[in-house]
Amino acid sequence: SAKNGAVVDLYAQWSRDTYKITYKTNGGELADGTAKKYNVDTRTFKLKTPVRYGYTFKGWYKDKKCTRRVTQVKKGTIGNLTFYAKWQINKYKIKYDGNGATRGSMKGVSVCQYGKTYTLTKNKFKRTGYVFEGWNTKKNGKGDFYEDGEDIRNITAKNGKTVTLYAQWSKKQYTIKYVLDGGTISSENPTGYYYDTPTIQLAAAAKEGYTFKGWYTDS
């Protein structure tokens, strides 16, 4: 003011500083809506959980060695921030189900770690009248199939899950051979059968000048 002796009030003007938040995800991905900026007046907010396939998140930390854990940014905080994600590798179990086996056992449970390769235990189950074909994650065979003794990796990414592998079986066909010694048989007589085939009545053979005396398993 040009007026002699006048008092002039000057008012300070302020703008909030904006600070940056850097996340070191160590192989993970940030969740949608993760805050990357804040200011001194931002309300206290919790840090969002990132995701990493095959791993369990163990928290955000202020240091690379992950010794100082942090769960939120409080109102009044200032300065750029850097947070480090800590992860634990997931583990899962594999057990074997005979799925109709008549003998044999595989009681052990294999503990596997995500990211590593393991060899499936060789099958020890038996099923009368059936041939073992392999393993499946579904009892009815409509899941993921694995060969006997196959190298597997990451059957599941879920921590603590037990994966049951079910034995898969196909019916074994047995052949019937007729030693006729010059005779003939009816086309009705089967040339094969399965373990669960209903009782078969064999038709008699025919040979000119001879009377058929029956079928035998030895000569």
Give the positions of each predicted feature:
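Secondary-structure capping and domain/repeat boundary segments
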Residues: 1-219
